């Protein structure tokens, strides 16, 4: 007999990058469906105000995902407030635009910029995964043997990186590459691991661009020909949580776009 799908109601989710964009949309959806959420974001991110807007079932945990101590403190806050951690959604990330070598300017991509993007996007994601897995491993398994769900955020840039995206594509490609082995690592203790690879979404990073640029980017999406709504990302997060047979896979959420150079 197939296992019953698990409702998000009553679950506790830690969401990195939770103060804005995809992370905030995820928190809004999960809290709206009866879950509790911990917004893990930088101290100056405005996360405290966002958590207050979401009510008593949401708290803010100021943290840098690259810091072991910060993430441990955030997880302790989650456990102290809500008793456990059932779900982790990794949305924290940064980007830089820089060619490997710019002939006109005579400039090379700095190692510092490359390292910083990998530190936040790839190392930060892994840091949260390894620490939250330890917390989830202490949960009592549900009737299907599940103790937790971890959902990471990659990007279509992991597959079709554009000019100037060497660092960003490398970081997101790393997330794609580690999804299956980590899912296999954690399968014996009942923790699922999934990754979403979004295309062009209406997050602050894009919506802050001139309207003409946003419209052009939206026109590149085959169908629907628009930017993705962060609520659609959040909807997929919920679907992954609720479907116990989704594991070890990367799902593109991109309106069929294939990025050009």
Swiss-Prot record:
Record text on activity regulation: The phospholipase C-like activity toward cardiolipin is inhibited by amyloid-beta peptide.
Substitution effect: residue 212 to E: In HSD10MD; 4-fold decrease of 3-hydroxyacyl-CoA dehydrogenase activity; decreased interaction with TRMT10C; decreased function in mitochondrial tRNA methylation; decreased function in mitochondrial tRNA processing
pH dependence text: Optimum pH is 9.3 for the dehydrogenase reaction at 25 degrees Celsius, and 7.0 for the reductase reaction at 25 degrees Celsius.
GO cellular component term, pick one: mitochondrial ribonuclease P complex
One term of GO molecular function: isoursodeoxycholate 7-beta-dehydrogenase (NAD+) activity
Consequence the record notes for mutating residue 130 to C: In HSD10MD; decreased stability; decreased 3-hydroxy-2-methylbutyryl-CoA dehydrogenase activity; decreased mitochondrial tRNA 5'-end processing; decreased tRNA methylation; does not affect homotetramerization; complete loss of phospholipase C-like activity toward cardiolipin
Modified residue annotations for N-acetylalanine: 2
Gene3D superfamilies the record matches: NAD(P)-binding Rossmann-like Domain
Record's keyword terms, sorted: Acetylation, Disease variant, Fatty acid metabolism, Intellectual disability, Lipid metabolism, Mitochondrion, Mitochondrion nucleoid, NAD, Neurodegeneration, Oxidoreductase, Steroid metabolism, tRNA processing
Binding-site residues, NAD(+): 20, 22, 41, 64-65, 91, 168, 172, 201, 203
GO BP: any one term: bile acid biosynthetic process
Pfam families: adh_short (PF00106)
EC top class named in words: oxidoreductase
Tissue: Ubiquitously expressed in normal tissues but is overexpressed in neurons affected in AD.
Keyword Phosphoprotein: no
Result, substituting residue 249 to Q: In HSD10MD; decreased 3-hydroxy-2-methylbutyryl-CoA dehydrogenase activity
Catalytic activity: a (3S)-3-hydroxyacyl-CoA + NAD(+) = a 3-oxoacyl-CoA + NADH + H(+); (2S,3S)-3-hydroxy-2-methylbutanoyl-CoA + NAD(+) = 2-methyl-3-oxobutanoyl-CoA + NADH + H(+); testosterone + NAD(+) = androst-4-ene-3,17-dione + NADH + H(+); 5alpha-androstane-3alpha,17beta-diol + NAD(+) = 17beta-hydroxy-5alpha-androstan-3-one + NADH + H(+)
InterPro entries given in the database record: NAD(P)-bd_dom_sf (IPR036291), Sc_DH/Rdtase_CS (IPR020904), SDR_fam (IPR002347)
PANTHER family: 17-BETA-HYDROXYSTEROID DEHYDROGENASE 14-RELATED, SHORT-CHAIN DEHYDROGENASE/REDUCTASE
Protein known as: 3-hydroxyacyl-CoA dehydrogenase type-2
Organism of derivation: Homo sapiens (Human)
Organismal lineage: Eukaryota, Metazoa, Chordata, Craniata, Vertebrata
